[in-house]
Amino acid sequence: EGISDDTIKGVDISSIVSLEDSGVKFYDFNNKEQDIFKTLSQSGVNYVRVRVWNNPYDKDGNGYGGGNNDLDKAIEIGKRATANNMKVLIDFHYSDFWADPAKQKAPKEWQNYTIGEKEIALYQYTKESLEKLISEGIDIGMVQIGNETNGKFVGESEWSKISKLFNAGSKAVREIDSNILVALHFTNPEKIGNYENISYQLSENNVDYDVFASSYYPFWHGTLDNLTTQLKKIANNYGKKVMVAETSYVYTNEDGDGHGNTSPANGQTLDYPISVQGQATSVRNVFQAVANVGEAGLGVFYWEPAWLPVGTSDNLENNKVIWEKYGSGWASSFASEYDSEDAGKWYGGSAVDNQGLFDFNGKPLESLNIFKYIMTGATAPKAVESIENVEVTVNSYKEIKLPKTVTVKYN
């Protein structure tokens, strides 16, 4: 309920160019090789999100990996999305590599800048980048100023300084096109008081933005009822639009490329079966949670549904060569000069190949059609998804008493 043609049904496929360069191929539902952008559009996707790093290369031009997502990659992805009738969200990290709550490093070129110099640089970089993107005919509907900026941004941790940088980016967007929505992106809706504090700080510091975007991964971020509650507070108290900028779910326990996956893992709560149906149900429910906010709820982006293996899991050494050459793993060894504590230690392949909406061979899963089915509905044959494990304790030489019932979950 509450889903319309205007609802954002988005995906972030920022890694796609590096994957294709690595030899990964994609197919349609008839197992015929086809441009993935066409397949996505045919499956109901209407928006593509793409991350942009300032300079994800070392001094010798070696890419840090994670898709090597510089502006040129964004232009290529944006043009292909636009050609297939999908709007584009540009996700500026304002970093040379991954930005998230644990790390918000300034780009190498900006690391010794004062806050005033950072404001100017961020404004100019945003404006010049958008001018290049738009000159290529890319249909930009939204720009994200930062990525998961929970109290840190471009190396700054004081809200007064963070807010100045947000406004520098927002100003650039407004000057380019007042119709482009300005989004800010945060995470951890499950932490008590987190979003209340962030939205309060944004208001107190007069930050100019349109959309409060949240990450929501079911195995990390609490209940959907809480997500709706948190987003509804922001919509009602501050008059902002809201959305989920990242979500995903596992469809298999298998690892496709020999590099470990982020889920399932110890300490995670998996409320849906690990299956294609479980994945589809998870995504459907995230859409409903955002729609339950009301008119302010814009929609949902699925994160990296096509970050597939570049080779099989039993061919790890060859996979490593490909990841290093094309940047198609989550990080390359070259990233250690910029991010020695994380990428420098744990570089490698895809950590989400088992959360794709395509199988390891590039064929779309039925769960990809969820972007259509949330509009039309769909009926599947009734089938058992999972059976709850039951433990029985018995004593030697005594009658074994089995439970009268067990819990079965259907699709």
Specify the residue positions occupied by each region the protein language model found.
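Glycoside hydrolase catalytic-domain groove-lining segments
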Residues: 34-37, 177-181, 196-269, 275-278, ...
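Active-site beta-loop-alpha junctions enriched in small/polar residues
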Residues: 13-16, 53-55, 93-97, 145-150, ...
